[in-house]
A protein has these predicted regions:
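Acidic/histidine-rich, metal-coordinating catalytic segments
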Residues: 73-87, 106-109, 173
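Active-site beta-loop-alpha junctions of metal-dependent nucleic acid enzymes
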Residues: 47-71
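Short, basic alpha-helical nucleic acid-contact segments in DNA-binding proteins
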Residues: 1-12
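Active-site proximal helix-loop segment of RNase H-like, two-metal nucleases, encompassing DDE(D)
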Residues: 113-145, 163-164
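C-terminal domain-tail junction helix/linker
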Residues: 138-203
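Two-metal-ion RNase H-like nuclease active-site motif
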Residues: 10-26, 35-37
């Protein structure tokens, strides 16, 4: 139910995006979480678990983010790691007349000019992955199906975007919803979020 609200909320996003992958265990085998988030607003715009870390997964992840924009920004910029699947995904969208700037940062050692220019992007993706692992995934000790892994990821994204205060945002949430913020404690905020999701489902 929360997915309706997370997906359809009218986010106010910037042109600066960052993406990354991390792994989770599903039935004891490695699967891959693809994240894209707004570098400035700290809003997660794409989130999905795939059984392969391939070009199709990158394309689906980027497309999920593009759907969050009413109109694609002219200077949309996506900063990712050095995985070549993102170059192929960029080519795919270019052939569909949906161009965007792709910047690939190799590692965390600041060995190249690009690495030195975009350290905040690298730090953001590392913090997001760390938050997911420490605050969500480690308590689950893996998943027994891909469907359950993605269901849990929806809840994590709802929490991260609407309920979790961020130090870099002066303890504000990435998305401030008055109906949620007026609730006295976290359980009440979750209930309100689910109520809003139900209303979105019936709209």
């Amino acid at each position: 139910m929360a997915q309706n609200y997370v997906e359809n909320y009218p986010y106010e996003l910037t042109e600066e995006l960052t993406g990354d992958e991390t792994y989770v265990k599903v039935k004891g085998k490695n699967h891959y979480v693809f994240f894209v988030s707004d570098k400035v607003k700290k809003i997660i715009t794409s989130y999905q678990v795939f059984d392969k870390r391939d070009t199709l997964a990158a394309i689906k992840t980027i497309y999920q983010t593009l759907l969050k924009y009413p109109v694609k920004p002219k200077n949309l910029q996506l900063v990712v790691d050095g995985n070549p699947i993102y170059q192929l995904a960029q080519l795919y969208f270019s052939l569909k007349n949906i161009p965007f700037n792709l910047i690939q940062v190799i590692g965390l050692q600041n060995k190249t000019e690009t690495d030195r220019t975009f350290p905040p992007y690298k730090q953001l993706t590392e913090r997001l992955n760390r938050s997911f692992k420490q605050e969500a995934y480690l308590t689950m000790n893996g998943f027994n199906s891909l469907e359950k892994a993605n269901g849990y990821l929806i809840l994590f994204t709802a929490y991260f975007n609407f309920l979790r205060p961020h130090e870099s945002l002066n303890r504000w949430n990435p998305v401030e919803v008055p109906e949620i913020q007026s609730c006295p404690h976290m359980p009440a905020k979750w209930i309100k979020l689910l109520e809003l999701s139900y209303e979105e489902l019936g709209a």
